[in-house]
Amino acid sequence: MSDKTLTRMDLSEAVFREVGLSRNESAQLVESMLNHMSDALVRGEQVKISSFGTFSVRDKSARVGRNPKTGEEVPIQPRRVLTFRPSHLMKERVAAGNRK
């Protein structure tokens, strides 16, 4: 496993190299795509990217948790959580990469 992290700048640079837009236009394109995805998730919509996966927001209800050190019951507030479900193709690509 690598310690490398793919950043916005890396994505912008890839768009610049592969699509041929200027660096500024590439950065704007990446930022616009991420904003569209974020806005859709905030509205509770799914973001499905073919051959990659699906991002969605789930509502978790309130529940009672337990402090592992003391054993004391602690209320956990209801919240929204972001989930990602990779496509079968993405799962296969990751698994194939692990076999190298």
UniProtKB/Swiss-Prot annotation:
GO terms for biological process: DNA recombination; positive regulation of metabolic process; regulation of DNA-templated transcription; regulation of translation. The keyword Mitochondrion does not apply. One of its GO terms (cellular component) is cytosol. InterPro entries: Hist_DNA-bd (IPR000119), Histone-like_DNA-bd_CS (IPR020816), IHF-like_DNA-bd_dom_sf (IPR010992), IHF_alpha (IPR005684). It comes from the Bacteria. Keywords: DNA recombination, DNA-binding, Transcription, Transcription regulation, Translation regulation. GO terms for molecular function: DNA binding; structural constituent of chromatin. Heterodimer of an alpha and a beta chain. HAMAP family: IHF_alpha (MF_00380). This protein is one of the two subunits of integration host factor, a specific DNA-binding protein that functions in genetic recombination as well as in transcriptional and translational control. Belongs to the bacterial histone-like protein family. PANTHER family: DNA-BINDING PROTEIN HU, INTEGRATION HOST FACTOR SUBUNIT ALPHA. This is Integration host factor subunit alpha. It comes from Ruegeria pomeroyi (strain ATCC 700808 / DSM 15171 / DSS-3).
